[in-house]
Each structure stands twice: as C-alpha cells, then as structure tokens.
Swiss-Prot record:
Acts as an ATP-dependent RNA helicase, able to unwind both RNA-RNA and RNA-DNA duplexes. Possesses 5' single-stranded RNA overhang nuclease activity. Acts as a positive regulator of transcription. May be involved in 3'-end cleavage and polyadenylation of pre-mRNAs. Binds DNA and RNA. Component of the tRNA-splicing ligase complex required to facilitate the enzymatic turnover of catalytic subunit rtcb. Binds (via helicase ATP-binding domain) on both short and long poly(I:C) dsRNA. Residues 1-448 are annotated as: Interaction with dsRNA. Its EC number is 3.6.4.13. InterPro entries: B30.2/SPRY, B30.2/SPRY_sf, ConA-like_dom_sf, DEAD/DEAH_box_helicase_dom, Helicase_ATP-bd, Helicase_C-like, P-loop_NTPase, RNA_helicase_DEAD_Q_motif. This is ATP-dependent RNA helicase DDX1. One of its GO terms (cellular component) is mitochondrion. It comes from Xenopus laevis (African clawed frog). Residues 70-247 form the B30.2/SPRY domain. PANTHER family: RNA HELICASE.
Length: 740
C-alpha cells in the first residue's frame, strides 16, 4: 500500500490494490501512474500481463473521482485557455501544429529539430486555396529535411500520406509513402524554392534558382482544399521566407509570395492553441473517461479491473459501464440514462451509441486506446480520429483532455502517426523495447514435410477435417502437385497436434489457429478423439474462442479454460489479443502468424511469473494454399478457391519464409525437433517441468560450482593474507616512527 501511496495514489485505491496482493508496482505502473496523475499524455508499451491495465486504470479512476468530488463541492477550475489568434495574423510556422521535438524561433521562421532518431514536422499558420504561390527555404546545416505542401488532414511526417507533397535533401520526392528520384540533392547553404499552382494542380521545386521541373500533379479531389507550408526535420535547421524579405531567387511565370496572397484565398489554420471547452452542465450519458478495447473479452477484463480498483472509492461512488456488441443494448441504454462516469467498450457498439446521440462525448476527460496497434490493424483509424474530433480539448474546469495509448509496440508506423494527430506532447514509456524471447520460454519448430513423412497417405478419412480449399482438386496420394502437398500438410498438422499433446502429457495449452474455420475444425477433431467442450478433464477437452461464437459462449469458454475445467483453448490471434491467462505451460502454433510481432505475442503467453513454458510451432516445408477472404462477406458462404490475383479468396502461404523473417526479427535461430516432437534437455536448465517455477540452479550449474569451489577458497585465503600483511605493515611503520 505504501509503495502505491508514494506515487500519489489515493488510500482507497491503494487499499484495493493491496487486497489484490500487489505489494509493489510493476515497472510500467511505476513509470506511467505519476505521469498520468500529473496531467500528461502517455504512450506506453509493455507485455501482456505486465500490469499495463492497472497503469492507466488507477490514475484514471483517481482523477475522475477528484473531478466529481470538486463538482460536488462546487469547486471550479480556470476555464480560460490561451489562444493563438495573434500568431495566426501573420505568415509563420505554427507553434500549435508541430512535433514534440520541433523548435520555432521567436521570428516564427527559423525552425530546428535536434532529434537524431525520429522525424519531427510542422505546418504554417496560414494556407491558400486558390492561385499560384512561392516560398523559399534556406538550409542552415547538413541535417535531413523534407519541405513542401500539405493539407491540415496530413501527418506532420510530410510525404507519408496522400495529403502531403514533399522534396527531401536526398534528392527524393515523397507522397503517400512513395519516394521517387527527383531533381538533385541539397544541403547546407542551399536555397529551395517551393511552388504551388492550385489552379493547374501543380507542385514543383527549385534549387538555388534552378527549376527542377514538375514534381506532383495534385489529385482532382484535393483541388478545393487549402494547402499549408510544411516541413519535417531530423537533426536539421531551416529558415523560411514567405516574402516579407526579398527572395534570393524571385519566382517567375506569375507565381507570387505567400505573404502577398489575397485575403480571399487565405485560410487560417484550425490548430490555434485553443480548443472547444466542454459544457459545465453534467449530463447522465456523458462519461468522464472512455476506454476503447479491440475485443469483447479484453473490454470485460478491463472493466473487472476498474471494479476492483474502485472498490473503496466512495462519496461520490463511480459508475462504470461496459458497452460491447453482441448483447442487447437495452440494459446499456438504461444504465446510460441513469448516469455513468467510466465507459469501457469496443468500437462498433460505441460508434452506434455516439451516432444516435445515446452516448455523449461532451465531458470526456480521458480517452484511452488499449492495444492501439490492434485497433488500427482492424481498421478503426477513422473511428478514432472521428471521436477524437468530437471530444472537447478542454474540460469545463480548465483541464486538458488526456489521451493514453497502450500498444504492444510503439515502433509501429501507424501508432506513431496516430500519436502525432491526437496526442499533446506525449511521454513515451517503452518498457518492451525490441522483441525478444524470455529465458523462461523454450520455443521449438517442428518441420511438417509431407514428402518425407508419408503418414498422411494411410489415414484415409480418419484425419482432421481440412478447410475445403482443395475440395475441387485432385489430392489423392501418389500425385506430385503443389495441391497434393498442401492438403497433406493440413492433414499432418492435425496428427502432429495430437502427437505433441500425448508426448508432453499436456494438461493445459493455448492452440493458435490461423482462421476461425481452422479453430472449428480443430475442435471437431478433438471431439473425434473423445474430447471436446463437454468432456471435463478428458485428455482432449477443449473450448473455442473466436469472433463467430456468440459473446456469452466466448465468455463462458474463457472462464472454463481459466478454471482448468478444460485443457485446451483453441483460438485466433484477434480473439486472444491482450487477454491475460496466467500459468499456461504450453502454446502450440498450428500455423505461423503472418506478422512476426504476433509470434512473440503468442509464445509470450507462456513463461510468465518465472514459470517455464514451451511453445511448439508447426512449420510446413512446402507452400500451403489457405483462405484469404477479400469478399464482402468476409468468408461467410464463400467457396471461391481461386487465387486472390485471379479474383478468388485464397493465397499460397509460405511458412519457411515467415520463419526466416521471425528468426531475423529475433536475431536467433529457433531450434528444430523431429516429427516425434521430443524436446531435448536444455544444456543449462536440464530437465524442465513446464508450468513450474524455474529451478534456481539446475543442469550443469551445480557441477560448475563444484569446479570453481577450490579456486574460490584459494582466493579467500589470499585475500585474508593480503589484509593481514597490510595491517602488520602499518603496525611496524608506527613502531619504527616512535623509535626515532
């Protein structure tokens, strides 16, 4: 309790935390809680199970409580907000529209960023929507930079999306992440001219007066948008000239200085340093905190944590609500009408309630995006930007909206791009760093080679039901086509799963399948083995977890697995994202994930709390044809087995290539075992019991100590002798001095 109290956590929350046996904060909690309590935006990355949910839930609960308490007692903060209206009255770079490490001089024209690892950008205070315009940029050093034009919808990282057009010092033009050769390189003492002809949809550049020719043709759908001066720097310094001073290389052909643009063609930036202030009157359906999760299970897990942390928070009590799809909305609407302070939910249902006016964002103080990389990969970028735009940036008591983003990795381009748009000078708390495999996890690869292991030819119809990709192909034994080997791989993988379970006498494991259909087929195969959902305690008892299962069934299945009522949880990556299941000794990858980061996420399910874990990956030696639905139904009722490039919904999946990418990512070679799946003893750990704590000393370590023991004893004797000699020498010196 004292450890959390020292970080400023209120006693009521600290008491609840203590009852959860959290004696000390985890690393992510120790770093993030003070930052959030201090009012800052925070980007945090840590492994699942590291206490990440507590890192944002605890401060959110406390600040929401303090806000409600102040309202209850009639206290009001200062709602005055500094505006940038005076800044917008002249052409200069905008201090309210820049990266966190981007500095602007007092004149508004000299710009600098000394960040050497990341790009930081900025836009001007004003833009233009009609006419032909020109400005100059002088390079003051040899750093990297891109200059050009962009709309307010663009990322500050100029040229990495479809709303910006840039020209870089390496002699590349950039638009929508496409970097092409253009003009020539430029560096210190060079002057770059930036031309914009909106009427003819042209962007071009010059170097020291030399016209470099057409760079971009502006798409027709952008013709009526306002374009702003833009740049992005990496350890560089530039100075802009919008025409208030004489140009070094005056433009020709009717181009005029931006500062001379007619008022009717000038558009002021919306990024003014001020913001919409939330209304003072409280609404029952207007929560103070909105926490968005990528899945129902993760939303339920987070809500349970919130309930635990707020257990002793009273006067006023906090009211929380879970908003997820797949369940009746009537009860959720009733709770909303009665009043709610913290909302936890998934994007679909939250979006529905916002669009119908049932959920108000007018008083949101906290916006939390948990597993942000998962939200973005599921296509919720527009949803996030849309709701962010509806939330007042300043609360009625004068506090700024706080945005907290949690992600498996902060090195994702999309996460960085999102943070630039919706966060205010965020602090990065990255305790995950580069992906690595914990010492408590043994991970091995089992090659699945149908050309060597002919077992599949003898199984007749007793094998696992396959996904139907080859139902129209001739895959009978004796053939030598890619389709034959692909179908054989699917059959062998089912047999290898059963073999692995029996070989290691697995009592609990998570089995990752690539698709929902694969999960269903694996569950059915376990039923064939005598197991399944209804066979509690059976060697092949199992439950399924994926988005096609109804929410009550998913919740029930997850609880049964956590309580060890069944041995195996068969699931997809999306369904299992972020769910914290402790003490699982085994993970089996039926198919390698197509994103290398997901491999680390999967095998990270084992080896937690210092318990040993084994991750087994089945890797096909040949390419496997698999479903890859691009149809509108997303696979429901789809039997189009043609390849994607031929208008179908299948691809050839190359697991050997994926394995090499994973090994390169982890900078290690993953051990391979034979198809009998016997894992040899580890040289250091010796015999390991997976699911148990790692032995403090094991394997060869004890013998190593015995070998070193005589040497250590000799060193101790020498140390004693040296110290005795030193003391004796000091005594003799004193006696000698006295004799004189």
């Amino acid at each position: 309790m004292a450890a959390f109290s020292e970080m400023g956590v209120m006693p009521e929350i600290a008491q609840a935390v203590e009852e959860m046996d959290w004696l000390l904060p985890t690393d992510i909690q120790a770093e993030s809680i003070p930052l959030i309590l201090g009012g800052g935006d925070v980007l945090m990355a840590a492994e699942t199970g590291s206490g990440k949910t507590g890192a944002f839930s605890i401060p959110v609960i406390q600040i929401v409580y303090e806000t409600l308490k102040d309202q209850q007692e009639g206290k009001k903060g200062k709602a005055s907000v500094k505006t940038g209206s005076t800044v917008l009255n002249k052409w200069q770079m905008n201090p309210y529209d820049r990266g966190s490490a981007f500095a602007i001089g007092s004149d508004g024209l000299c710009c600098q960023s000394r960040e050497i690892k990341e790009w930081h950008g900025c836009r001007s205070t004003r833009g233009v929507n009609k006419g032909k315009y020109y400005y100059e940029v002088s390079c003051h050093d040899q750093g990297l930079c891109r200059v050009g034009w962009s709309t307010l919808s663009a990322s500050l990282d100029l040229g990495t999306d479809k709303f910006g057009f840039g020209f870089g010092g390496t002699g590349k033009k950039s638009h929508n992440k496409q970097f092409d050769n253009y003009g020539e390189e430029f560096t210190m003492h060079d002057t770059i001219g930036c031309y914009l002809d909106i009427d003819n949809s042209i962007v071009k550049f010059s170097k020291n007066g030399k016209d470099l020719g057409l760079a971009f043709q502006i798409p027709s759908h952008m013709k009526n948008q306002a374009f702003f001066t833009s740049c992005v720097l990496k350890n560089a310094e530039l100075k802009f000239n919008f025409g208030e001073e004489d140009f070094k290389f005056p433009p020709k052909d009717g181009f005029v200085a931006l500062s001379k643009a007619p008022d009717g063609h000038v558009v002021k930036s919306q990024n003014t340093g001020s913001a919409q202030v939330s209304q003072t009157k409280s609404l029952p359906n207007a929560p103070k905190a909105l926490i968005i999760e990528p899945s129902r299970e993760l939303a339920e897990q987070t809500l349970n944590n919130v309930k635990q942390f707020k257990k002793y928070v009273d006067n006023p009590k906090l009211r929380e609500l879970l908003i997820i799809g797949g369940v009746a909305a009537k009860e959720q609407l009733t709770i909303l009408e009665n009043g709610v302070d913290i909302v936890v939910g998934t994007p679909g249902r939250i979006d529905d309630l916002i669009s119908t006016g049932k959920l108000s964002l007018s008083q949101v103080r906290f916006l939390v995006l948990d597993e942000a990389d998962g939200l973005l990969s599921q296509g919720y970028s527009d949803f996030i930007n849309r709701i962010y735009g509806q939330i007042p940036q300043i609360t009625s008591d004068g506090k700024r909206l706080q945005v907290i983003v949690c992600s498996a990795t902060l090195h994702s381009f999309d996460v960085k791009k999102l943070s630039e748009k919706i966060m205010h000078f965020p602090t990065w708390v990255d305790l995950k760093g580069e992906d690595s495999v914990p010492e408590t996890v043994h991970h091995v690869v089992v090659p699945v080679n149908p050309k060597k292991d002919k077992q599949w030819e003898k199984l007749a119809k007793n094998h696992i039901r396959t996904d139907g990709v080859h139902d129209k192909d001739n895959t009978r034994p004796g053939g030598n086509s890619a389709e034959v080997w692909s179908e054989a791989i699917k059959v062998l993988k089912g047999e290898y799963i059963v073999r692995a379970i029996k070989e290691h006498k697995m009592d609990q494991a998570i089995i990752f399948c690539r698709t929902k259909l694969d999960c269903d087929n694996m569950e059915q195969y376990f039923i064939q083995q005598g197991g399944g959902p209804d066979k509690k305690g059976h060697q092949f008892s199992c439950v399924c977890l994926h988005s096609d299962r109804k929410p009550p069934e998913r919740k029930h299945n997850l609880e049964r697995f956590k309580k060890c009522e069944v041995r195996f949880l068969i699931c997809t990556d999306v369904a299992a994202r972020g769910i914290d299941i402790r003490g699982v000794p085994y993970v089996i990858n039926v198919t390698l994930p197509d994103e290398k980061q997901n491999y680390v996420h999967r095998i990270g399910r084992v080896g937690r709390a210092e318990r040993m874990g084994l991750a087994i990956s089945l890797v096909a030696s040949e390419k496997e044809k698999v479903w890859y639905h691009v149809c509108s139904s997303r696979g429901k009722g789809c039997y189009n087995t043609r390849l994607k490039e031929d208008g179908g919904c299948t691809i050839w999946y190359n697991e050997m290539q994926l394995l090499s990418e994973i090994e390169e990512h982890l900078t290690c070679t993953i051990s391979q075992v034979e198809p009998d799946i016997k894992v040899p003893l580890d040289d250091f750990d010796g015999k390991v019991v997976y699911g148990q704590r790692r032995a403090t000393g094991g394997g060869l370590y004890k013998g190593h100590v015995d070998i070193l023991a005589p040497t250590v004893q000799e060193l101790a004797s020498l140390e004693k002798e040296a110290q005795t000699s030193f003391l004796h020498l000091g005594y003799l010196s004193n006696q000698l001095f006295r004799s004189f």
